[in-house]
C-alpha cells in the first residue's frame, strides 16, 4: 500500500509571545502544496525485526529510529500490536526547508497504517497521535488550508483556495537552524491577525502579510533574501520564506503564463496549484 505525503507552505508567520516553557506562540496559515514524497509499507516476513526502513531520493541524516515515519509506526505498533513492516520512503521534499516534509511523512504513515490494518481510527484520534510526534504533524491528517496558533498545534479551518495560481518554490543549498532563527526574534502581536489578512485579495498580501523569521534569517543568509527579491522581479504577486527557511516561494497570477524558471539553487519546484 502506497501513499504520497505532500509539503506545505506558510502564508504569513507571526511570533506573538514567548511562553514560560521556553516555546513561542505564533500564528500562521498552513497551505498544502503538491510537492510529494512517496511512502509504502508491506508486511515484513522476517519477524525478528519490527521494521526495516528503505530510504531513497534526497538524503536524510540520522539513524532509522530517529525518522518520523518509524516513530509513527512504533507509536501505533505499541498500542495495536501491528505486524513487522518494510517501510519504503522516497524523499522528494527537501529537509530543513520549512516545508514540513518529515511531519507530512509521519502523518501519512499514521493514515496508511490505519487503512492497511483496519484500525478504524477517526481523524480526530489520528490528530492526537500526530501531535505526539510534532506540533505541525496533525495538520497533515486533514491536509486542508488551516489557521494555526499556539505553538503551531491549535487549528481552525480557513476558507482559502489558490487554485490556478502558479507556485515557484526555491530552496538554496543552505541550512537554517530553527533554534537560531527563534533566538533572534522579538515577539509581538501584529496590528491585524492573519485570520483577517488571509481574506484579502492575494494582490494585497505583499504589504500586510509577513514572516517574522525573515528579519533574523535574511541578514545571516543573504542568498535567501535575494531569491525572494528575484521572485518579485520575475512577476510574483506574493513571495515569502516558508517557516524558518530556507525555502522561498512565489505566487504568480493565474492570468500570467510563466515559463520554467532557473535559479542558482539546490532545488526548484514549479507547478500550478489545483
Curated annotation (Swiss-Prot):
Q: Which residues cross the membrane?
A: none
InterPro entries (alphabetical): GHMP_kinase_C_dom, GHMP_kinase_C_sf, GHMP_kinase_N_dom, IspE, Ribosomal_Su5_D2-typ_SF, Ribsml_uS5_D2-typ_fold_subgr
Q: Which residues form the active site?
A: 8, 136
Q: Which reaction(s) does the protein catalyse, per the Swiss-Prot or TrEMBL entry? A: 4-CDP-2-C-methyl-D-erythritol + ATP = 4-CDP-2-C-methyl-D-erythritol 2-phosphate + ADP + H(+)
The UniProt entry, under Pfam families, shows: GHMP_kinases_C (PF08544), GHMP_kinases_N (PF00288)
Entry keyword annotation includes Magnesium: no
What Gene Ontology terms for biological process does this UniProt record contain? isopentenyl diphosphate biosynthetic process, methylerythritol 4-phosphate pathway; terpenoid biosynthetic process
As one GO molecular function, the record gives: 4-(cytidine 5'-diphospho)-2-C-methyl-D-erythritol kinase activity
Q: In which residues is ATP bound?
A: 94-104
Enzyme Commission identifier(s): 2.7.1.148
Q: What class of enzyme is it?
A: transferase
| Entry's family note | Belongs to the GHMP kinase family. IspE subfamily.
Primary role:
Catalyzes the phosphorylation of the position 2 hydroxy group of 4-diphosphocytidyl-2C-methyl-D-erythritol.
The protein, known as: 4-diphosphocytidyl-2-C-methyl-D-erythritol kinase
What is the gene name?
Answer: ispE
Amino acid at each position: 500500500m502506497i501513499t504520497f505525503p505532500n509539503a506545505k507552505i506558510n502564508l504569513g508567520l507571526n511570533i506573538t509571545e514567548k511562553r514560560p516553557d521556553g516555546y513561542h506562540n505564533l500564528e500562521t496559515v498552513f497551505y498544502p502544496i503538491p510537492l510529494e514524497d512517496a511512502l509504502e509499507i508491506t508486511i515484513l516476513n522476517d519477524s525478528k525485526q519490527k521494521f526495516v526502513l528503505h530510504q531513497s531520493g534526497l538524503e536524510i541524516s540520522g539513524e532509522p529510529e530517529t525518522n518520523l515515519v518509524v516513530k509513527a509506526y512504533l507509536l501505533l505498533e505499541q498500542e495495536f500490536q501491528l505486524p513487522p513492516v518494510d517501510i519504503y520512503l522516497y524523499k522528494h521534499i527537501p529537509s530543513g526547508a520549512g516545508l514540513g516534509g518529515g511531519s507530512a511523512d509521519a502523518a501519512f504513515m499514521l493514515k496508511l497504517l490505519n487503512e492497511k490494518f483496519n484500525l478504524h481510527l477517526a481523524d480526530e484520534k489520528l490528530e492526537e497521535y500526530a501531535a505526539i510526534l510534532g506540533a505541525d504533524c496533525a495538520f497533515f491528517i486533514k491536509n486542508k488550508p488551516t489557521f494555526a496558533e499556539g505553538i503551531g498545534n491549535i487549528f481552525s479551518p480557513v476558507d482559502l483556495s489558490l487554485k490556478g495560481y502558479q507556485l515557484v518554490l526555491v530552496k538554496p543549498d543552505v541550512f537554517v537552524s530553527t533554534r537560531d532563527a527563534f533566538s533572534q526574534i522579538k515577539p509581538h502581536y501584529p496590528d491585524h491577525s492573519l485570520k483577517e489578512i488571509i481574506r484579502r485579495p492575494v494582490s494585497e498580501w505583499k504589504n500586510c502579510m509577513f514572516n517574522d523569521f525573515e528579519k533574523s534569517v535574511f541578514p545571516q543568509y543573504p542568498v535567501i533574501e535575494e531569491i525572494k527579491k528575484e521572485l518579485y522581479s520575475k512577476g510574483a504577486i506574493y513571495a515569502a520564506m516558508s517557516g524558518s527557511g530556507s525555502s522561498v516561494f512565489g505566487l504568480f497570477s493565474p492570468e500570467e503564463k510563466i515559463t520554467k524558471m532557473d535559479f542558482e539553487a539546490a532545488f526548484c519546484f514549479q507547478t500550478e496549484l489545483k
